[in-house]
Amino acid sequence: MEKISRVWFDSRRVYIETDASKVYSRPLEAFPVLLEATEEDRLDYKIGRFGDDIRWPSLDEDIHITSFMEETAEPDYANDIAMIFSRFPQLNVSEVARSIGINKSLLSKYIYGIKKPSEKRKQEIVSSLHKLGRELIAI
């Protein structure tokens, strides 16, 4: 297996170069912790001893080389969940995720269109937001 030799970022993507001189990249939306991190925190990484992973100790984030090599979705900002959060930017992703019992990172991937929620999960998200709306009306 190839080994990671270099890591860098631009405004929307994270890149790796391997010892085989191949370059791979993924959108930062695939890694919400890195997307929200400062440039300084993004640059504070260590390539693992075997060259197959990257660790950001200050962010408690790890990414394996296979995350760059898999056929995975690019961001799709035109999805239903993204449109809801775009229309209501005051929504707190962490709190909405907590209210439906999922990880913030997973909800972020739904918002960015990196992962697609099942119809059941989409309904759970919408129902949670409807509940919030009813609570706001009751004030």
What are the roles of these predicted feature ranges?
Residues 1-139:
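Motif-centric detector for short Cys/His coordination patterns
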